[in-house]
């Protein structure tokens, strides 16, 4: 990336996050990054967990917190004027992500895996496997360090990395690349169906609170979206799945079970699906709507249409 950045007139800054969870080896990794950046003449910003408690919470073991911490650091870098953050995700990470999501339950959106870019973020190494990046380092005479937690099978991703992926590569040595290529195709299909799903939700939106049952009317008046159920029921099931995914994703991980629960709610036409302590979707009298515990305030004396939070 460094020679390419020079050709394109792009200034590089390295960002390293010390999670503080691995003691001496975490400090070793930080020292390694500092040495490499000093030798290559690259500016470096180092973050420690204590600096980011407000954004990421107190340090604790687990992939979710570590990822939240990293992206809190990246957001600070972006806020300081960096144009984009380039992460080091490879095609091997892409293959692991696909297998992990398929095992947990996912649809086309999840099968698209890690996107090559999104606002503020680039993933320039998705076209390479982990073995490719190591080969490049060897060719350039560069060393690397390995996070020892990647060698343990405590995490599901590591078990896939050490078990499922090698087994697949035993069937076809290009398995990692083929899985990553499938993600690219799934992403293109996902984008097309997402446009169809957006059009469906737009056409099904209700606009007049007076014609809606109580709970839906309260939702609409408080700024929550309301949809007529019939257009949703009549659409192609794949388009409906995509539409429901777009409703779940802003609230929580859009696992397949939540999509199925909402699809059943649309089909039955009455009831409620609780996504979190504060957010649920309700259906009654031909409409579907979203409720939030602190926004759907009923007028005094009016009855709720769905069970209380």
Identify the meaning behind each predicted range.
Residues 140-177, 181-184, 188, 283, ...:
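Mid-to-C-terminal catalytic subdomains of enzymes
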